[in-house]
A protein has these predicted regions:
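The substrate-binding groove and active-site-proximal loops of carbohydrate-active enzymes
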Residues: 9-16, 50-63, 110-123, 146-153, ...
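Short, acidic/polar
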Residues: 14-30, 121-134, 179-188, 269-279
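Aromatic- and glycine-enriched glycan-recognition loops and surfaces
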Residues: 14-31, 54-75, 126
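Substrate-binding cleft and catalytic face of glycoside hydrolase catalytic domains
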Residues: 35-51, 64-152, 293-296
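Aromatic-lined carbohydrate-recognition surfaces of secreted/lumenal glycan-active proteins
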Residues: 81-86, 90, 142-154, 160-184, ...
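Active-site clefts of carbohydrate-active enzymes
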Residues: 199-212, 228-269, 291-307
Length: 327
């Protein structure tokens, strides 16, 4: 398996990355036997229709913190995929960021015709290019240029221009993180090195399915994955994949809302086992970045009640360690 990875840092805010406490978490993650980490962090725009965004001095991870985290990950023997992500401050899913195709004429203060798409992509391209520069000089082995930006994916010319500009700065492999079931929307995967997707595919109808039952359910999803891999001649990476430790979550692995679901480590462990069995030997598949590993480890006394995506000190951690420790 080329990429035996985990996503790290997503819950971080300014002041969290790069600390000794964070490094302890990285070491525990590396101890599972993986060889990669996706360092994920967020920058926000105010709402889905905003055309400008930037660094938030109150909460955005600083460049120095990100660079220190990269150094810590590498010192633990992990390759790094840098993954800057754009979110909306109002809680709207980033997939809903979009703008009218037929715009009424709007003019700026200088009397020039404005374009929502031009403004947004200009800002987004600058955002990704900034972190491409960090990825280049810190030696990150991969860069992810976007995550689940469904409402923008049809703007092929803008994405191709972004990729062109990024390649002038960063000289490693590039990937884009599509959403599960929506991979066909991305017509420009040919310009990248890998096909990425958030692989939150449902593998049961209700809670309590066995690992064998979940593994069988993967066969349906694998057909579509192989089709898209064959179309572009690129390997697929699960840029995100995971399941909470709660009964019923393998029916909706993306879910983080239903806090009333009862805690169930077996549900999570079976989901992990099924995905690893299903994908491990597929020639069109490059690997996993599981979602997600906490920036700072959760205290043991809280883990016994936790129903989140984290797997530290849960049954799924043992499952993944057994697979990732394979030569």
């Amino acid at each position: 398996m080329e990429i035996k990875g985990f996503t790290y840092g997503w819950d971080s805010r300014k002041g969290m990355l790069g600390t000794e406490k964070a490094n302890e978490s990285i070491k525990a993650m590396a101890a599972m036997g993986g060889n990669w980490a996706a360092l994920a962090f967020a920058v926000t725009q105010e709402k889905f229709s905003s055309t400008r965004f930037g660094f938030d001095y109150r909460r955005t991870d600083t460049d120095r913190e990100i660079e220190t985290a990269i150094k810590q990950l590498k010192e633990s023997g992990l390759k790094v995929c840098l993954k800057p992500i754009l979110n909306c401050e109002d809680g709207t899913w980033r997939a809903n960021i979009t703008f009218p195709e037929r715009e009424f004429p709007v003019y700026d203060e200088h009397g020039r015709l404005k374009s929502y798409w031009n403004e947004w992509f200009s800002c987004y391209t600058a955002f990704i290019c900034h972190y491409a520069e960090i990825a280049e000089y810190t030696g990150c082995e991969m860069l992810c240029i976007g995550c689940e930006m469904i409402g923008t994916e049809h703007k092929e010319e803008f994405w191709r221009e972004l990729i062109r500009q990024v390649r002038e700065i960063y000289h490693g492999p590039l990937v884009y993180n599509a959403n599960h079931g929506k991979e066909e929307n991305v017509k420009w995967f040919d310009a990248l090195d890998y096909i990425g997707t958030s692989a939150y595919y449902p593998v049961e109808k209700e809670g309590g399915a066995s690992a064998d039952e979940m593994t069988a359910a993967w066969e349906y999803h694998k057909k579509g994955l192989k089709k898209i891999a064959d179309k572009f001649g690129k390997k697929i990476i699960f840029m995100e994949i995971g399941c909470r430790s709660a009964r019923g979550c393998a029916a909706m692995p993306w879910d983080f809302v239903h806090r009333e679901f009862p805690r169930d480590e077996d549900e999570q462990a079976n989901f992990y086992e099924s995905a690893l069995r299903a994908m491990w030997d597929e020639p069109y598949f490059a690997g996993f970045f599981w979602w997600d590993w906490e920036t700072n480890l959760m205290p043991d006394e809280k883990i016994k009640d936790d129903i989140g995506f984290g797997i530290h000190s849960k049954k799924a951690e043992k499952v993944l360690t057994e697979w990732y420790s394979k030569k």
